Amino acid sequence: MTSNAHATDAAFKALAIAWTTREGRILDLFAQPDRFERFSVAYGDLLIDFSKTAITDDILSQLLELARAGGVEAQRDAMFAGDHINLTEDRAVLHTALRDQASDTIQVDGIDVKPGVVETLARLGDFATGVREGRIAGARGGVITDVVNIGIGGSDLGPAMVTLALAPYHDGPRCHFVSNVDSAHITDVLKGLDPATTLFIVASKTFTTVETMTNAATARAFIVNALGEDAVGAHFAAVSTALDKVGAFGIPADRIFGFWDWVGGRYSVWSAIGLPLMLAIGPDRFREFLAGAAAMDEHFRSAVLDQNLPVLLGLIGLWHRNACGFPSRAIIPYDQRLARLPAYLQQLDMESNGKSVTRDGAAVSRPTGPIVWGEPGTNAQHAFFQLLHQGTDIVPVEFLVGAQSHEPALKDHQDLLVANCLAQSEALMRGRTLEEATAQLRAKGISEDKVAEIAPHRVFPGDRPSLTIAYATLDPFTLGRIIALYEHRVFVEAAVWGINGFDQWGVELGKELATQFLPAVTGGALPPSASASTSGLIAHLDAVAGG
């Protein structure tokens, strides 16, 4: 074990002791009248309040020491410098270059990638503007009214999430997303679409992703059957680097937009993968989105650790995961247009940090990535908040809420939304004692026998941690900041855990086996290594399908 690893291990042990020996409850910490001021940090209008966690001054100091011991600053600087920090794939990690609006040059392996980034963004802008203005039209001259993005994973979750989030800024064609190879997905999306006014974007770096190419073939047939083979080029664009394969599909070179191997799929929404968003909101708004992320990048690089939002968010995550032993975190945006944010963050976090070996291939010595899940409020309150408040597992909650909505005429809705968000975080912390529950029931005139029967069911343990991310309005700039905040939070946690947060070998085995099992599903033989369970399931599915 290196000296750095020794320091990290010692810091984790000290934090675990701080948790197990703590006295009192989170609510008791508010005896300090300035707790909110000392345990919340703002960057412009974007504020993180973590005062409703069990973190104290001493614990925060230990967490900051953990960040230093884990080499967060050095690893951060290595990422921005273009070093190959993705060791298993021998790649740089520079999605930040896609939104960098300050640097004159960005070096990767001695090559300045800035001109290519600028050129690609300009090409995307020209194409999006042409479609939005009707100059780039369908094969029969029809203005494009609908765009269907076909991708999966990072080629779907990112653009789908941000396009929904920025719906108030849509002034271009309607955007739809197809990801699942389930025929129901593309069938339902294509219903009601006019082939003559529909543009498909096929997003696959290699142009070989099975789910994406299966859906792309169906979309191609949709166009060919209605408009003829010659119409394919006018109704498709591609985000890919496989020029030969894309050309063979029928998509002309001027409709192919590439990105680089130093951009991971779950970090690619800033690249040509974000084309659906640009078509929906326009190039200028898209640049505002990039600018928000760039601002958070600069904050991450320059802010001192105890005022650094991504660092603090990462350290809070490490505290809850490793010191407190909480295995999951819930993301609850009080904004319906952020409905896809929890799913997006599931991939960002769980695909990055769901690792069981360190960067050098040794087994990790402590739990790593948590289970990330959630739904928007207030819907979530009527679904799973029962467990959050009274269940046997403690789940740290991360609330997101804006001060203003995009519907000023419905301010009463926003007021109710904000009140619910604040009430839930307060209730999770405060709880309700048996004495309070008893007094509340007695005040209603209920008999003593009934009070004794019901009161235990109305007790809330409380002392359940949450943090709140608050901002003015969900606009393109703010959304960019929020996504980059979470990207860097995941980076901080991976750095301290000593894992590679930029590969995803865990997705490979299932894909390999699916290729082996497909012949058996279609009537052939299973490989000898398949289990009796798989054989039995195939036989049952074949029987009930009438095969």
Curated annotation (Swiss-Prot):
Pfam families to which the protein is assigned, alphabetical:
PGI (PF00342)
Give the similarity note: Belongs to the GPI family.
What PROSITE patterns does the annotation carry?
P_GLUCOSE_ISOMERASE_1, P_GLUCOSE_ISOMERASE_2, P_GLUCOSE_ISOMERASE_3
Q: Which gene encodes it?
A: pgi
Keywords of this protein's UniProt record, alphabetized? Cytoplasm, Gluconeogenesis, Glycolysis, Isomerase
| CDD domains cross-referenced by the UniProt entry | SIS_PGI_1, SIS_PGI_2
Q: What is its EC number?
A: 5.3.1.9
The record places the active site at: 351, 382, 511
Q: Which stretches are transmembrane?
A: none
Q: Where in the cell is it found?
A: Cytoplasm
Superkingdom, taxonomy of origin: Bacteria
**Name used for this protein in its record:** Glucose-6-phosphate isomerase
Q: In which pathway does it act?
A: Carbohydrate biosynthesis; gluconeogenesis; Carbohydrate degradation; glycolysis; D-glyceraldehyde 3-phosphate and glycerone phosphate from D-glucose: step 2/4
Instruction: Name any Gene Ontology BP term.
Output: glucose 6-phosphate metabolic process
